[in-house]
Amino acid sequence: MRKILAGVSAGTFALLYGMLVLVLLIIFELTGVPLITAVIASAIVLLIQFLISPFLTDLTQRWFYKTKFGAEMPPYLKAFIEQVCHEQNMKYPKMGFIDDGAPNAFTYGHTKNNARIVLTRGIFELLTEDEVKAVVAHELGHAIHYDMLLMTAAELVPTVLYAIARGLMEGMKSSDGDSDSSKSAAAQAIIAAVAYLLYIIAQYIVLWFSRTREYFADEYAVEATKNPEALSRALIQIGFGLSTHADTKDRKRGMSASSTNAMGIFDTKASKSLVVSCFVDGEIDKTHIKNAMKWELWNTWAKWYELNSTHPLISKRLQAIDRLAPQYGRAPFVNFDLQKPESYLDDFFREIAISIAPVIAFLAAAVVAAVLFIQERMGLLWVAAVLLIVSAVLSLLKYRFTHPANAYHEATVAGLLAEPKVSGIRSIPCELKGTIIGRGDPGCIFNEDFVLQDDTGIIFLDYNQPLFILNKIFALFRAKDNLDQTATVRGWYRRSPVPYVELYTIEAGGKTKKIFTYGVGKVLRWLYLVLAVAALAAVFML
């Protein structure tokens, strides 16, 4: 594994820094300007950020997440970490604990000798001892592989390329209007465009590199625990969150806080995860697990979301772990064998079309209006007004598609998860009943979102009022009143890439809270249509 890991790292850095050197050589050859200042400045900023980031993150964790560093870990976990540290010749990491029922785990730091690992109460409540060790082994793998340091070095390239593109564009604005300056400006414009294009490419290479590091961290976790099934179970519960054992509730009752730019077990942006029971009559029922995997392996949206993510899709990680299982005398845990019933590509393009159609119509209206004004053909401005009306109508139709107003059917987390035809655009109106067990961003006092648990699992609830300040006031002063309360929620189930419910109403603690974003959005779209019609009327009155 180490040779492959070194080869992947070397190849990635050769490609990234090769792109950067190419741009610098082109700049020097065509303009004579080395732009070394921009390169040095970007490198210094990134270096300073790298050096102080762990300490700033420590403060953020203490102040905003109430993270307790130095918390006593369970004996089995402490012994496991000590064993790994001894084998890898590394210092015992600084352990942090967040008293929140939502599961999360992540690591940060400079090197393996000053790594921090933070775990939430939900990790201990949802996972068995072997699964907890697998999660921590994954985080230790990041530290042992120097992933924090390598990712910082990789991110330097797109940072410098962006600085070059911006610097060249700013230089063009201050150039004189003579012939030589015009030629220089044209050259700078071409180089700026190339630098920006390479910046975008470099960003995607860095994301790919990050996803690759996750696979290697998984591989290390399997190597350290000799238990691929434990890591698969843990990923299923944290990433999908599928519960793979029957004693979760008993373990949860016995767990308390007293007993127990980071790289996590899964993408923190994708923390809207859920837990679904897969334990039936004393045996693991793989049906729910395979249902959860269908969306990631079949739906085209999943591939798009993964392309823009720092972490691979959970289903792909499970398949990679299954391929490792025979090396440790184990059978593959999941063995996804379902047949794709249809192509979901048509749904993907249909939803994209629905999403961008109002914008295209608006841009068409703006272009037509601009051309007519330039040509002083005011008599044809009605064409632009009609296009504006079309844009408004399409906006209303899009909103009706993204927020179906039909009945909110009673559902379960397990039932919603099994639906492959859903995305950030296509939703399912639903009603869920359960208990609010934590905040969406575990422990964060500024986070207004929740995690709800029903009889089949847990799911993220997206609480989003029209004004940002209203969300933060609710997070600081009202959100805590809903924790550990029985709740009924209504809203729209989505997946982008992980499952969540966009809230419309939430009933908890005998009180009903309504989220007004849907209503405000609807009013604004009708107002848009009224203004578009008024514009058409004004054109005919000219």
What is each of the regions a protein language model found here?
Residues S423-C430, L467-R490:
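Short nucleic-acid-contacting surface segments enriched for D/E, G, S/T with interspersed K/R
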Residues L126-L127, E131-V132, L140, M148-A163, ...:
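Extended, hydrophilic extramembrane loops/domains of integral membrane proteins
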